[in-house]
């Protein structure tokens, strides 16, 4: 996986990739839920990304203000805000990438699955609009529970006759970001140099960081590995509790969402060897959806990479996560097919 790159220095990043300002393709990106806790900082970070030429910000309300604020930033992209369902089609038309952080946030005592009944309906309606107005766009699903919302989106797209498994992604990048941060702290290595694959799903025990494959290598005890794994799995809860009922992991999620969207854009633009972890349709295991390393390209998913060698602890973790992940997938598919 590529090391995380500073979005603030995004212009120089593009120069390092060999683009001139004239050669960067025109790319329209939409953020659905742009007035929310994740959506606002995500809109800011996408405005800083020079791979974006048009930034479309949509929410049920509040978006004109967010769009006006962000539009004053002196970067490449043109920003437009859209509010209300009647403007959703215009927001989506011509999009290359659609990022969906829409939905209600977690509160203390809530799991991601507690959000299901509200967020599942939101995801279903937004995906139906994507199927109608930009059926070939890459979809980055942030709305929780991702283990279920990605299967919901797949079923909606299938019903519309436009499903392309290569273009639907569950964004699990925050799990990777957390695993890198926590590992670097314990291993005493520079965090910018750290890579840690995270596989499985995006909730609780379904999150499985593969610390045995982490680089740079560090000789950490089994107890340290178990503690790092648990902290990565509980990272969202850690933030919810720290915010004492006043929010969830909005800022770090926006950062992770922007990183993954940047990777998708780079792949679309033909940058070679862009590899990130994501929750996608997969044949890596017997489950229809699974998070693992994915090579990104001009069509979205170019290749879903194998899990690689696992430690005994990771093999057990993989075994333990499968029933819960299977249940979440089935829950999403059932919801999508109820109506």
From Swiss-Prot:
Entry GO CC: mitochondrial matrix
GO molecular function terms attached to this record: L-malate dehydrogenase (NAD+) activity
EC number: 1.1.1.37
Binding-site residues, substrate: 106, 112, 144, 178
Transit peptide residue numbers: 1-19
List of residues binding NAD(+): 33-39, 59, 119, 142-144, 253
PROSITE patterns per the UniProt record, alphabetical: MDH (PS00068)
Catalytic activity: (S)-malate + NAD(+) = oxaloacetate + NADH + H(+)
InterPro entries from the UniProt entry: L-lactate/malate_DH, Lactate/malate_DH_C, Lactate/malate_DH_N, Lactate_DH/Glyco_Ohase_4_C, Malate_DH_AS, Malate_DH_type1, NAD(P)-bd_dom_sf
Keywords assigned: Mitochondrion, NAD, Oxidoreductase, Transit peptide, Tricarboxylic acid cycle
Example GO BP: malate metabolic process
Active-site residues, as the UniProt record annotates them: 202
SUPFAM superfamilies to which the protein is assigned, alphabetical: LDH C-terminal domain-like, NAD(P)-binding Rossmann-fold domains
Record localization: Mitochondrion matrix
Subunit comment: Homodimer.
Family designation: Belongs to the LDH/MDH superfamily. MDH type 1 family.
Protein name: Malate dehydrogenase, mitochondrial
